[in-house]
Amino acid sequence: MGVCGSLFLPWKCLVVVSLRLLFLVPTGVPVRSGDATFPKAMDNVTVRQGESATLRCTIDNRVTRVAWLNRSTILYAGNDKWCLDPRVVLLSNTQTQYSIEIQNVDVYDEGPYTCSVQTDNHPKTSRVHLIVQVSPKIVEISSDISINEGNNISLTCIATGRPEPTVTWRHISPKAVGFVSEDEYLEIQGITREQSGYYECSASNDVAAPVVRRVKVTVNYPPYISEAKGTGVPVGQKGTLQCEASAVPSAEFQWYKDDKRLVEGKKGVKVENRPFLSKLIFFNVSEHDYGNYTCVASNKLGHTNASITLFGPGAVSEVSNGTSSRRAGCLWLLPLLVLHLLLKF
């Protein structure tokens, strides 16, 4: 529905209106392309939603009557306003130009507008099309999501605007390169922990700055012990065993020795836990403290463990995590042993 499409004049004016404007309703001869005669309206007028649109019609002194219409609805006839919409105002009515303005334009104002004139010969009309552009707007987007590693996810971003906006998805990550999807829907099969983070939806149509919204994707996975560090400490000194684990949600840590759990508050020993790191601290190491300790990291998706050794000076340490092991010892003795055997023979 165009400007004033639902408004009516008082009944007292109806008959007079019909008689005065009978010749103006577009039954006149349309002005053909390239016709140099009047009236001559503007080319298509393009404005943004909320702006004002000016419709101009070039005429000359042969015109006896003139009017602007929106489809079959009369907006102005001469200096008389036939539309009750306060947004429509007369700008000029001279011997050379007849112009109106539509203020605070909205999408329902879009459509054809006709400049109709009466001369001594016959009515003529000229038409202009009003195009209303609308800034992009994201009307629907997925909520933040938490999902287990290996599952599939689908993200949605619906945007409106005129012209229809282009929607793109991008993974906000140092490892992500460019756009991951140029569509309203982003689907990820078998998601990995590296694909967690923020996903940015952008809607653009060159009418205004792109509109951007973000969705946070949290990928849950079981603990993985990335570092388990043993240490050699003399008796009477302070020693620390460290166990670092990556997990979402964050891992909970427990320490064991000889299948017995070490609890907080044991004399001379302190367990210090952080979201991804646990420390077993000995304030005054004794001979009894030496040996293998087991760090267990767990969350709701699983658990893992690593064996860590507290040893004295010159002893060999072993740290095992799954199938991997690391040994540190007196490897400098090996070349001397080989040299001794060669000299013997």
From Swiss-Prot:
Positions of glycan attachment: N44, N70, N152, N284, N292, N305, N321
Keywords per UniProt: Cell adhesion, Cell membrane, Disulfide bond, Glycoprotein, GPI-anchor, Immunoglobulin domain, Lipoprotein, Membrane, Repeat, Signal
Positions of the Ig-like C2-type domain: 39-126, 136-218, 222-309
Positions of the propeptide removed during maturation: 322-345
Membrane-topology descriptor: Lipid-anchor; GPI-anchor
Keyword Lipoprotein applies: yes
Places the protein is found: Cell membrane
Lipid-substituted positions (GPI-anchor amidated asparagine): N321
Disulfide bonds: C57-C115, C157-C201, C243-C295
Signal peptide per UniProt: 1-30
PANTHER family reported for this sequence: IGLON FAMILY OF IMMUNOGLOBULIN SUPERFAMILY-RELATED (PTHR42757), NEUROTRIMIN (PTHR42757:SF9)
Family of this protein: Belongs to the immunoglobulin superfamily. IgLON family.
Protein name: Neurotrimin
Gene name tied to this protein: NTM
